[in-house]
Amino acid sequence: MAESNGKGSHNETSSDDDDEYEDNSRGFNLGFIFGNVDNSGDLDADYLDEDAKEHLSALADKLGSSLPDINLLAKSERTASDPAEQDYDRKAEDAVDYEDIDEEYDGPEVQVVSEEDHLLPKKEYFSTAVALGSLKSRASVFDDEDYDEEEEQEEEQAPVEKSLETEKREPVVLKEDKALEYEEEASILDKEDHMDTEDVQEEEVDELLEGTLDDKGATPLPTLYVEDGMVILQFSEIFAIHEPPQKRDRRENRYVTCRDKYKSMDISELVEDDEEVLLKSHGRIDTHVEQADLIQLDVPFPIREGLQLVKASTIGGITPESREFTKLGRDSCIMGELLKQDFIDDNSSLCQSQLSMQVFPLDQHEWERRIIWEHSPEISGNSGEIFEPGLEPEGMLVKGTNSETEQESLNVVNSRVQVQADNNMFVPFSANLLESFGSRGSQSTNESTNKSRHHPQLLRLESQWDENHLSGNDEAGVKKIKRLEKDALGRFSRLVLRERDLGDEAWLDSIIWDSEKELSRSKLIFDLQDEQMVFEIFDNEESKNLQLHAGAMIVSRSSKSKDETFQEGCESNSGWQFNLSNDKFYMNGKSSQQLQANTNKSSVHSLRVFHSVPAIKLQTMKSKLSNKDIANFHRPKALWYPHDNELAIKQQGKLPTRGSMKIIVKSLGGKGSKLHVGIEESVSSLRAKASRKLDFKETEAVKMFYKGKELDDEKSLAAQNVQPNSLVHLIRTKVHLWPWAQKLPGENKSLRPPGAFKKKSDLSTKDGHVFLMEYCEERPLMLSNAGMGANLCTYYQKSSPEDQRGNLLRNQSDTLGNVMILEPGDKSPFLGEIHAGCSQSSVETNMYKAPIFPQRLQSTDYLLVRSPKGKLSLRRIDKIVVVGQQEPRMEVMSPGSKNLQTYLVNRMLVYVYREFFKRGGGEHPIAADELSFLFSNLTDAIIKKNMKIIACWKRDKNGQSYWTKKDSLLEPPESELKKLVAPEHVCSYESMLAGLYRLKHLGITRFTLPASISNALAQLPDEAIALAAASHIERELQITPWNLSSNFVACTNQDRANIERLEITGVGDPSGRGLGFSYVRAAPKAPAAAGHMKKKAAAGRGAPTVTGTDADLRRLSMEAAREVLIKFNVPDEIIAKQTRWHRIAMIRKLSSEQAASGVKVDPTTIGKYARGQRMSFLQMQQQAREKCQEIWDRQLLSLSAFDGDENESENEANSDLDSFAGDLENLLDAEEGGEGEESNISKNDKLDGVKGLKMRRRPSQVETDEEIEDEATEYAELCRLLMQDEDQKKKKKKMKGVGEGMGSYPPPRPNIALQSGEPVRKANAMDKKPIAIQPDASFLVNESTIKDNRNVDSIIKTPKGKQVKENSNSLGQLKKVKILNENLKVFKEKKSARENFVCGACGQHGHMRTNKHCPRYRENTESQPEGIDMDKSAGKPSSSEPSGLPKLKPIKNSKAAPKSAMKTSVDEALKGDKLSSKTGGLPLKFRYGIPAGDLSDKPVSEAPGSSEQAVVSDIDTGIKSTSKISKLKISSKAKPKESKGESERRSHSLMPTFSRERGESESHKPSVSGQPLSSTERNQAASSRHTISIPRPSLSMDTDQAESRRPHLVIRPPTEREQPQKKLVIKRSKEMNDHDMSSLEESPRFESRKTKRMAELAGFQRQQSFRLSENSLERRPKEDRVWWEEEEISTGRHREVRARRDYDDMSVSEEPNEIAEIRRYEEVIRSEREEEERQKAKKKKKKKKLQPEIVEGYLEDYPPRKNDRRLSERGRNVRSRYVSDFERDGAEYAPQPKRRKKGEVGLANILERIVDTLRLKEEVSRLFLKPVSKKEAPDYLDIVENPMDLSTIRDKVRKIEYRNREQFRHDVWQIKYNAHLYNDGRNPGIPPLADQLLEICDYLLDDYEDQLKEAEKGIDPND
């Protein structure tokens, strides 16, 4: 090197070593290539040939003026060469740079630093006088420069072009790393405050050498210093890096003196090579960085804020110390806030620090820092530097760990001693300061490692910041620099000593920050398109504009300053110190530029997607989707017409009505508000109150609807029948204009997330741009929720590398989103290739990518916006685009997968965390039912398992369980909650629900994966129907969203390498016509025929090859091979010449050729011999790409908008628009239509046809059930709003009684859980869907969306909370029902073991006979029932009773009754059925007598489980159930003294009553009345009413007992006390017909006669005769007459039945052939069944005579009693037939009223046939079949006073309300009149249908004239 090098070190070392590397003086670096040199700088041996010597001499002459300290100058003078060779190394003007610009340094992970990297650092061979200049031009051959930047640098740095040329062989260092390589690189700024986008090092070189180097010396080579304008080369720097590793020890040995001096501190033997790499590059602690000053990337890294950047200036000289200290290494950082420490004045400490410097082994140090430099030449004023003065006193800190070296400490101090530059002084070097070791090797390593932490953007930020800061404090900086010069040595000593403890972070606590002076930042230049940058800026004025308009994320400044450390290679800051696996060293060693280049080439063109804050917090996503939400998942429906909740209408009167009336006013947007109004207030007053809640002016025109009718503003609520707790819909009709909606938010608001869209209100369309996107797919795989972000990108495919049109697209205003330019060699980001020179826009999210195609926006198109409060607004649309087929990036969750369960658990935990810390934890717990409802797909066990970790499970006094927050639970940070559930996970889950919903409606519930039916398909028989159905199921399972997304992601996750594994075309095509891609996985082989597969399988069991199959050519005989060849048209002459094997070979060849050419051959004879055509993998890929490109082009052509095509099809488009308008009107009509006032059961009974002019298809049972469930959920929400006040009152005071509170519904706690022995949540068992309202504003609707909901009988069908469920074996099971007084409450009740007890006294469940609450407690033993079958009483089925059949058990009535939970009113249950069901089931009217002292009305009470299903389920639902038997337990015990007093009340009937005065059956007032009987009423009941009389309690009982006992539903026949209890079984048949219902009626004394007949059949004549004689003495004459009248009526009824059948037989011939055939068939079936029943009855009768016992069947015989009566056999047969008829018809229809007269029955039969005929004429009668609902015609009842329809007429016929044909015709005429009255002028097509209907009716009446006359004659006019 320079001669000064040798003088500084050779004096001590030259005599100690004589090997080839012994000289460390001038030119010692030449020894690496030229051999050893002597003391004079000459070579000690002639190693060079003549050419090399000439070249070296020429080079020395050229640079001679720059090498004053090297004796090589003399050598060069002696060996001067020709002038022509003087420019040998000059870069020619036409020189071409052949370096690969993509060739970059791979970093320490790939290129491990060798030993010579540390032995010979580049800085150590620099001249002391050129410390600054030589370090500035770092573009040596050791650096892998980005030559694109160097070309630009050459234009700006022409003077140094030549000097930098020869250094291109230096090892590669990335350009962004060089900025921090040395202190000089980071400390020089351009004088003109210019900041370019190139490396800081390049501009620093330009500033240093500007004006000092002439054009001749501007060679881009490493320089030692500048002298006389010439650049001096540094040969050792060029060649020393190539020193072999094995010579390292020998080089160390030549420093004998230095080595001995520091030998005591050398521990190089303890450190391995890999540890050296680790210690030099890993774990560097940037403790000086404050959080507020960070600019973060994806991998956090610190900004070296305190880095001192110096500006080029002129100084007179520089001290030796400054020369040392100016060599600031890359690994040292200087804080802008320095430590408050004074420097030690003792300069001798610098010498003493030499020992302390040697802390680590020599191989870990930059040992060349020990070289002592002397006689440094004076530097010219232009090459000096001035240190930045403004930041010096703020503080200083050296970063490093045990891996850092003394060089870092020296460099820190060196940077401070530069300050002598201002004084223009030259101080000779006098101290023995050693340079730090490792300035080359470690820096090369550290540069690469720091590269991951420092973005190129940071270089400009740092430079600009320091440059701006330098300008204002020059004067103060001079003083600080002087002080630093004085204290440098002491400070250096202490910092080096402290470096040992840098690994221990305790020293961080001792840092004192000087915050007296606020450091201001200058305006920064940001790359707003760089999405990888995350800025954190100060909250000052100049940064606000940047914050609002930055493209990258901006993180607000932390409120608390923290000293944080960072670790390269870690994902986050937290816990980096525990990263012991050294992940950085196992990362891919490519640089960020290389990774970015590879990323672009691999088609991963993705930008970061930002979501709004509400979306990240899942505030815009429902925890549970309703069935309507899932059904309309891909096409959400808006409600534009008021929709009444039928359940709410039914229950509104049952809610509390105390105080003012509560009304819920709800807008169509979904916003509801509860208002308190007086019942006499007007609607205008209600509207005024609603205006304050729903934010509209009182003067604004709004409409209010109640039950489909618009309310009049002037009338009061009471006058318009607005009930308490009602739901009133408010419709705002005014449309507001938003002309300025397209304006962007103001300057004080952000435009992009996360700064923008921080609240849900920010997500509205009231401002900003609106793009409408329409998906071309019917069911896109995934859809984003509200608030989720998406990126718009436009890809441009270059046609050539020089194509610059992509840059022009960025400047065009119509370009969508970011422009991504694809090079010619890049792959397309889509399945199809983008054509060269073309662009394609796309929308990209984290879930999918899809192409978009802009469409022409019509000038007349506007967007109508409706707010949640119902406000309508109109705004412009910015763009409208069509979204092509999605390419998923993530998989949709699969049902039953582990990912699904994990998501559900995490979603629940996130919900619970947020609720706990929002509610306050313990004060507002979370009900367990709430979690079960919201996360119904999780079982209770899973919920409890996960909740126990964070919450405590408790119960309240009502037995309700809830969760409270644990005291030790800490609120997790929001970032952790975001990681648990991302918005994309929610979308994936909702897509899965939509897929399951579709499968459910297709009837596919057992399979969710196509693989699950492969075995099932193999087992199917070869039947076309079965195979077609299986194929349909398989196809539907293949196109589920989870299968399609999984297939695509699996096949494209490796750069679309396996796209050929998809079908591309086929069933998965969403367009269905070749415009989309099919993501169904391709079958590995074509499926063979089923028969062929079986044969192959059968043969395969014997041998694994084709041997033995039909395709085996070896099985062909000579003749068979000849026949096959003849089919191939081979001449017989050729065949005859060939042998058998030649024939077989020819068959194989010909069949394979035809199969390959596509010729169709018979697959069973010829084609089966063809060999399969196999393609190579490349051929398959090419074929798949061609398919994709073909589909892509078709999709592009179809979805792109072309003006020409639009103009050509304008007329067609207009016609389509008209058609669409008509369809839209029909849809709106359908929305307004709905079901009206039809009950919920009517939804199951809808007919195919039209309502009005709209076609309405018949809804499936699944849809009906879902609609019912959604209404129940909606009603639960309404109840929650209504009961808020009640709940608040209950929290303040205890409930005084069960009868107080909010009424019978909704209950505060659910008692609707299924009461059965099986677990509720068992799979495939029974799905529970109970509804309950919680007082804490929560509600419960348990369901399972994944399971098969086989039958949903919602609580609408049982308004009092009762539900009907069916399990897998189709046996109905009911819940417990308790009937109490009015205003009762419902709460969940534990099922105790007591309920299994059966009382031996009264037969009731729940207590024993010794219980004082028993009705028969302490009663005489004689009065207790005898012979009770305990098995039957306990609910065990007998031999004649199917298992599981429910019973109507005795009703519990005791003092404990007020504790019961549920009140059930069969009365109300039947009301809901009377509009929709064909029959009302079997309503019963009970009348009973009670003690005279208790005559108040009381409802009937039932014991738990007493009403199972017969009376409630079948009656309420009107749906045929599997449980067909209803039982009434009739107590057979009666007091002897009661028999006489109660003889008047001994008539028992199970038939509904018929009131002749009113002409209608009381059974059609569905109720269970509990009215007490007065003495006069009892007599009337005996004669005119057919009731079940309940006797009073025994008069012999104590008074208190009698009063405490309330009347039971215990029916006692008039028998002696010794009679055991009997059961009357009523079965309902499975047939659905409405004939012979008159046979069901019985006389008031039927119960007595029944008992007598049973006794007669038992054969006890003697007892009967005795009983008759006894009773005849007691019976009064009046009663005798009644008795015989009943007998006559019974006989007459039997004759009427026969007459009716005769009428039926006569009418068969007159009816149409189809009807006649049906009636004949029914009659045959009926007669056969009756005959079977008679035979069974006879057999039973014979058995009973032999062995009388209690049996349950159609005929029941009582055990023998002495007082039993005996009646004729004829009466018994009549009773049997009555029961049989009742069983046959009761399933569908309510029991028909009694038809007492033959004429009435005949007339009813004829009229019913006429009605049925009219109903069959659907083309005429379809509009008149059902009553007109309010939704079809809201004003219908206002216009039509007497509505009539065929259903009503049929009901009146069955009730025998018509006395003649004129009454019947009048009702048909009423239909015609109503049709004209309402539809004239509205629907002109309807009145003609009504006219035609009346004409047909008249024709039928004439046809039946004779029969009608005969029937009318038999009708008593006085009757």
From Swiss-Prot:
Pfam families: Bromodomain, DUF3591, TBP-binding, ubiquitin. Residues 1713-1750 form a coiled coil. Residues 1465-1476, 1535-1547, 1555-1565, 1628-1655, 1726-1735 have a biased composition (Basic and acidic residues). InterPro entries: Bromodomain, Bromodomain-like_sf, Bromodomain_CS, TAF1, TAF1_HAT_dom, TAF_II_230-bd, TAFII-230_TBP-bd_sf, Ubiquitin-like_dom. Residues 143-158 have a biased composition (Acidic residues). Expressed in roots, leaves and inflorescences. Keywords: Activator, Bromodomain, Chromatin regulator, Coiled coil, Nucleus, Transcription, Transcription regulation. It comes from the Eukaryota. Residues 1794-1911 form the Bromo domain. GO terms for molecular function: histone acetyltransferase activity; RNA polymerase II general transcription initiation factor activity; TBP-class protein binding. GO terms for cellular component: transcription factor TFIID complex. Its main location: nucleus. Residues 1-25, 143-169, 1287-1314, 1408-1679, 1726-1746 are annotated as: Disordered. It is found in: Nucleus. One of its GO terms (biological process) is DNA-mediated transformation. Residues 661-737 form the Ubiquitin-like domain. Residues 1736-1745 have a biased composition (Basic residues). Component of the TFIID complex. TFIID is composed of TATA binding protein (TBP) and a number of TBP-associated factors (TAFs) whose MWs range from 14-217 kDa. Interacts with TAF7 and TAF14B, and (via N-terminus) with TBP1 and TBP2. Belongs to the TAF1 family. TAFs are components of the transcription factor IID (TFIID) complex that is essential for mediating regulation of RNA polymerase transcription. Core scaffold of the TFIID complex. This is Transcription initiation factor TFIID subunit 1. It comes from Arabidopsis thaliana (Mouse-ear cress). The lineage of its organism: Eukaryota, Viridiplantae, Streptophyta, Embryophyta, Tracheophyta.
